[in-house]
From Swiss-Prot:
Protein's name in the database: Ureidoacrylate amidohydrolase RutB
Reaction equation(s) it catalyzes: (Z)-3-ureidoacrylate + H2O + H(+) = (Z)-3-aminoacrylate + NH4(+) + CO2; (Z)-3-ureidoacrylate + H2O = (Z)-3-aminoacrylate + carbamate + H(+); (Z)-2-methylureidoacrylate + H2O + H(+) = (Z)-2-methylaminoacrylate + NH4(+) + CO2
Pfam families associated with the record: Isochorismatase
Example GO molecular function: hydrolase activity, acting on carbon-nitrogen (but not peptide) bonds, in linear amides
Length: 230
């Protein structure tokens, strides 16, 4: 067992019964020229987030924590996105951007395309799990719940983009399914103004989970000798 400093209080977990979840670190969300950028969201501060996620992933992997990577998106015909009968059709900023800019049709969040791919700096390794997801929550229409339960995993450490959308949505759904969710705040970034990040973290630490940092996570899961060297 290890104890992680967090807000509103420290949380204790067993690394072998935990997973680090990397949410949607795709070009769409973290790169210039990706969906968020083209839709008018600021992605200029994502590079430190990428670096922090890379650090957290390395520490988690060394500690024997399962790494799960999510990629948000749909088939290139957008059947999986839902038609006018789906609220996703009306609220997805990717779909709205393509309707407003027809020349982008088939490029944003389409499986197999650059936008859908994980950023170059973050590469899954053998033993990791990579899951596609069609909506904001990683629990919706995916095998995430069964994959976690079959491994006895109850604690989920969250990183990724966007804090106030897919990260928070997945953590909230996990809360309702009796998972303990922790967000590493400096390994996340919001879609929208800074207050969206603050509001999401407030919601999480007050109602749905815990908030910590990459440095505290690495110290908590690293052997004492490695922690001292770091």
């Amino acid at each position: 067992m290890t104890t992680l400093p967090a807000r509103p209080e420290a949380i204790t977990f067993a690394p072998q019964h935990s997973a680090l979840i990397v949410v949607d670190m795709q070009n769409a969300y973290a790169s210039q020229g990706g969906y968020l950028d083209l839709a008018g969201f600021d992605v200029s501060a994502t590079q430190p987030v990428i670096a922090n996620i890379k650090t957290a992933v390395a520490a988690a992997r060394a500690a024997g924590i399962l790494i799960i990577w999510f990629q948000n998106g749909w088939d290139d015909q957008y059947v999986e996105a839902g038609g006018p009968g789906s609220p996703n059709f009306h609220k997805s900023n990717a779909l709205k951007t393509m309707r407003n800019r027809p020349e982008l049709q088939g490029t944003l969040l389409a499986k197999g395309g650059w936008d859908y791919q994980l950023v170059d700096e973050l590469v899954p390794e053998p033993g990791d799990i990579v899951l596609p997801k069609p909506r904001y929550s990683g629990f919706f229409n995916t095998p995430l719940d069964s994959l976690l339960r079959s491994r006895g995993i109850r604690h989920l450490i969250f990183t990724g983009i966007a804090t106030n959308v897919c990260v928070e949505s997945t953590l909230r759904d996990g809360f309702f399914l009796e998972y303990f969710g922790v967000v590493l705040e400096d390994a996340t970034h919001q879609a929208g103004p800074e207050f969206a990040q603050k509001a999401a973290l407030f919601n999480i630490e007050t109602f749905f989970g815990w908030v910590s940092t990459v440095a505290d996570f690495c110290d908590a899961v690293s052997p004492p000798s490695l922690a001292r060297i770091a």
